[in-house]
């Protein structure tokens, strides 16, 4: 009887263990942070919709001192994602064939997080969704709102000329 109980426990345990390992493997992701508003998720290039972050080479001025605000925006995203899984809701593709999406970590929008922390702007040309987050950061002088800066779209335009 004792042997049969051990055998039964073993026969039940093995499938349960395999199931748990399968779930953990399914959740593993390969994430590369390109910049503040672009990631590669399992090889797919994803551009966050509704926001725009400073370019990596872009700097801001705080009390007359250059601040690498583009690099800081990327680092804030790296820190927020850390070792968490990222879930994205696709909204189609852009002209560069990137997936346009809003992405989340622990059910929190990464776009909202970046805008609210003052290192992304509501990209009003495409969406009004993140304007309240931007207003909050601006009113409270959070992140780039405590500095002199060029909007990313103005910075890109100045580099084309």
Predicted regions and their residues:
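Small beta-barrel nucleic-acid-binding modules, primarily SNase/OB-fold domains
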Residues: 2-161
């Amino acid at each position: 009887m004792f042997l049969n109980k051990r055998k039964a426990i073993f026969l039940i345990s093995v499938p349960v263990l395999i199931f748990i390992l399968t779930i953990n493997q399914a959740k593993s992701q390969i994430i590369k942070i390109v910049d503040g508003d672009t990631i590669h998720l399992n090889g797919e290039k994803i551009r966050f919709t509704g926001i725009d972050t400073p370019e990596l080479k872009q700097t801001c001025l705080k009390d007359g001192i250059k601040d690498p605000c583009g690099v800081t925006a990327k680092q804030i995203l790296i820190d927020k994602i850390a070792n968490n899984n990222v879930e994205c809701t696709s909204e189609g593709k852009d002209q560069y064939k990137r997936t346009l999406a809003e992405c989340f970590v622990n059910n929190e929008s990464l776009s909202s997080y970046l805008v609210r922390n003052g290192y992304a702007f509501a990209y009003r040309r495409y969406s009004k969704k993140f304007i309240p987050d931007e207003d909050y950061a601006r009113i409270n002088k959070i992140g780039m709102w405590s500095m002199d800066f060029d909007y990313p779209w103005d910075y890109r335009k100045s580099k084309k000329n």
